[in-house]
């Protein structure tokens, strides 16, 4: 096999040494090796978190997902791979291969870019700690087309054996905040599975208005929650991010983490409200108690707690 530099091609040549003549050559010109590694390829793989060329097909998209898996120690399923875990959720979820999308790769790719940007917000080794003692399971992401439920859903977190599954709608415009919301649900599930009282219910309830009880119903929460307690309701005394936060304690906490982690323009302002700040402190302490945090430093969700109260 010879490399023809003039034609930039490989040629298969059969030689009979008995019919060849040999002469010595004093000077030679070094030909570029066809085995030379193009280091620009690694830049395309490991460069910016967004803005890389669109994968040409599902195989290239799978390769991108594989790189994210290795980078963050998570599991990512695509297209029809999501069907099994989605069935385990006992909810009606349409996977992207069943959605009749004009270009399935183009629909999923931005959702993987958003996932890359989101996972980069968490400390190194964070997601590894979701695995069991044998190193099995962990966090599994399922980019899907849509959910068919009794109320509007754009993402959900559920457990499937040793997996903390996070299904999320690829067409949503606020994927980073959505993912931060669902990652908190998975985090809370991990904490409570190891310590049922990881977040003390009495301590949490003490943060809320006197006599308040969560609605535990989507329609009631969205229709009846008073704006006088809501951050997105022009309240003076803020207890909750928005009406959805009043549905139950889990959604209250996930909504806080959604905006603290995924909405940088709101995080500091939200954490300046004493009750929200106290709730965030409770959540941060639970994570510190339930994870090996050696080498973490100040996490993104703890950063707003370091900002001095501007009202002081």
Describe the residue ranges of each PLM region.
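Non-catalytic architectural context of zinc metalloproteases
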Residues: 3-110, 219-233, 250
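Residue-identity detector for threonine
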Residues: 5, 21-23, 28-29, 36, ...
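Auxiliary, metal-adjacent structural segments of Zn-dependent hydrolase domains
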Residues: 12-14, 20-23, 78, 86, ...
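Exposed alpha-helical structural elements
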Residues: 63, 114, 126, 275-278, ...
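Hydrophobic, Leu/Ile/Phe/Ala-enriched alpha-helical segments that form helix-helix packing faces
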Residues: 68, 115-130, 183, 187, ...
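Active-site-flanking segments in enzyme catalytic domains
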Residues: 134-312
């Amino acid at each position: 096999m010879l490399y023809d530099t003039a034609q930039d091609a490989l040629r298969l040549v059969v030689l009979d040494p008995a019919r060849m003549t040999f002469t010595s050559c004093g000077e030679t010109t070094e030909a570029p090796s066809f085995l030379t590694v193009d280091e620009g390829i690694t830049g395309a793989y490991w460069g910016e978190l967004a803005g890389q060329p669109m994968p040409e097909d599902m195989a290239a998209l799978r390769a991108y997902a594989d790189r994210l898996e290795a980078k963050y120690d998570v599991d990512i399923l695509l297209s029809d791979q999501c069907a099994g875990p989605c069935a385990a959720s006992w909810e009606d979820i349409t996977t992207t291969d069943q959605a009749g999308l004009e270009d399935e790769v183009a629909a999923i790719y931005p959702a993987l870019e958003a996932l890359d940007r989101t996972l980069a917000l968490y400390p190194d080794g964070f997601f590894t700690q979701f695995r069991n003692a044998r190193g099995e399971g962990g966090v599994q992401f399922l980019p899907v087309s849509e959910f068919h439920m009794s109320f509007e859903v754009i993402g959900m977190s559920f457990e499937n054996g040793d997996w903390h599954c996070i299904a999320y709608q690829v067409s949503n415009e606020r994927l980073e905040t959505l993912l931060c919301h669902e990652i908190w649900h998975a985090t809370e599930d991990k904490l409570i599975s190891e310590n049922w009282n990881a977040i003390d219910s009495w301590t949490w309830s003490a943060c809320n208005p006197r006599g308040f009880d969560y609605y535990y119903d989507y329609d009631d929460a969205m229709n009846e929650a008073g704006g006088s307690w809501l951050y997105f309701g022009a309240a003076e005394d803020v207890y909750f991010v928005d009406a959805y936060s009043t549905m139950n304690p889990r959604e209250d906490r996930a909504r806080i983490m959604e905006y603290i982690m995924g909405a940088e323009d709101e995080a500091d302002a939200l954490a300046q409200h004493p009750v929200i700040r106290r709730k965030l402190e409770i959540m941060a302490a639970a994570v510190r108690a339930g994870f090996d945090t050696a080498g973490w430093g100040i996490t993104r969700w703890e950063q707003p707690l370091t900002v001095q109260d501007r009202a002081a």
